[in-house]
UniProtKB/Swiss-Prot annotation:
Its EC number is 3.5.1.44. GO terms for molecular function: protein-glutamine glutaminase activity. Belongs to the CheD family. Probably deamidates glutamine residues to glutamate on methyl-accepting chemotaxis receptors (MCPs), playing an important role in chemotaxis. Keywords: Chemotaxis, Hydrolase. Pfam families: CheD (PF03975). This is Probable chemoreceptor glutamine deamidase CheD. One of its GO terms (biological process) is chemotaxis. InterPro entries: CheD-like_sf, Chemorcpt_Glu_NH3ase_CheD, Cytotoxic_necrot_fac-like_cat.
Length: 173
């Protein structure tokens, strides 16, 4: 930093973390101080998983609860297989499942096409919680439900999960 009295002091350059876009039915993992982002979370859910010990972070954008009735296809599209794929990719990058924590957002009741009155958003939320529990990953923050869309950002170096929606201020989980 330049000081105008003739002296100079050095300060470390502050760099903006890399922005990694996670599309619908995709997941990404990083060990770098990046910002993982996804948008368009209506009934979809963004699941951020962070390893608090090894600084490995991942984000998946799931659309539907279960791949049980689907043969093949994109695993990241479904809560059960998308979360499993994300956890496996994080473990491959050096994460420990014992140190993982999850934060989740989305699951809005945007549309109701079900016969039993249960919306896709609420079924997604239920399956996300069940799947994380099966893998021993606690949910430490969530912003679910409502009737509005969301966008999220995961700060990979801190685990902060920033949720933005049209009708509220940003919140950090």
């Amino acid at each position: 930093m330049k000081v105008y009295d003739g002296s100079q002091t050095e300060s470390p350059e502050q760099s903006t973390p890399e922005r990694i876009k996670v599309g619908i039915a995709e997941y990404k993992v990083t060990t770098e101080p990046a910002m993982l982002t996804t948008s368009g979370l209506g009934s979809c859910i963004g699941i951020a998983i962070y390893d608090t010990r090894n600084t490995v972070a991942g984000l998946v954008h799931v659309m539907l609860p279960s791949a049980a009735d689907i043969d093949g296809g994109n695993h990241a599209k479904f809560a059960d297989t998308g979360i499993q794929a994300l956890i496996e990719a994080m473990a491959d990058a050096g994460a420990s499942t014992e140190a993982m924590e999850a934060k989740i957002a989305g699951g809005s009741d945007m549309l109701d096409f079900s016969e039993n009155g249960s919306s896709i958003g609420s079924r997604n939320a239920k399956k996300v919680r069940e799947t994380l529990d099966e893998h021993g990953v606690p949910v430490v923050g969530e912003d679910l439900g409502g009737d509005h869309g969301r966008s999220v950002k995961l700060e990979a170096d801190t685990g902060n999960f920033i949720v933005k929606s049209a009708n509220t201020d940003s919140i950090t989980l």
